[in-house]
Amino acid sequence: MSTAIAQQKIRIRLKAFDRRMLDLSCDKIIETADNTAATAIGPIPLPTKRKIYCVLRSPHVDKDSREHFETRTHRRIIDIYNPSAKTIDALMKLDLPSGVDIEVKL
């Protein structure tokens, strides 16, 4: 009969349009977790979402002339195992760029 020890885990999902800003945010989170003696796994890259918008170039006629625009949403996951109260406080005080969307699950 084996007993598994339940580990606490924080899962952080990050989304951004700019890949460089996303990677810098991931580095800050991992550095904070390492400084507080928690184990950080990641960043794990998830598939990039591409959204393409098609717009008519002319304001009146000429439907054959169109222009395409796209937005790319880059995503990452970071798992932090065995977080202490110090780890959670440090993550809450972390200053990250406004262009990065963060979801935290405990």
UniProtKB/Swiss-Prot annotation:
Q: Which InterPro entries match?
A: Ribosomal_uS10, Ribosomal_uS10_dom, Ribosomal_uS10_dom_sf
**GO BP, one annotated term:** translation
CC annotations in GO: ribonucleoprotein complex; ribosome
| MF GO annotations | structural constituent of ribosome; tRNA binding
Q: Which domain of life is it from?
A: Bacteria
Establish whether keyword Ribonucleoprotein is in the entry. Answer: yes
Keyword vocabulary terms for this entry: Ribonucleoprotein, Ribosomal protein
SUPFAM superfamilies recorded: Ribosomal protein S10
Listed Pfam families: Ribosomal_S10
The similarity annotation says: Belongs to the universal ribosomal protein uS10 family.
Q: Subunit structure of this entry?
A: Part of the 30S ribosomal subunit.
- Function, as annotated: Involved in the binding of tRNA to the ribosomes.
Task: Supply the name of the protein.
Answer: Small ribosomal subunit protein uS10
Supply the source organism for this entry.
Prochlorococcus marinus (strain MIT 9211)
Gene name of the encoded protein: rpsJ
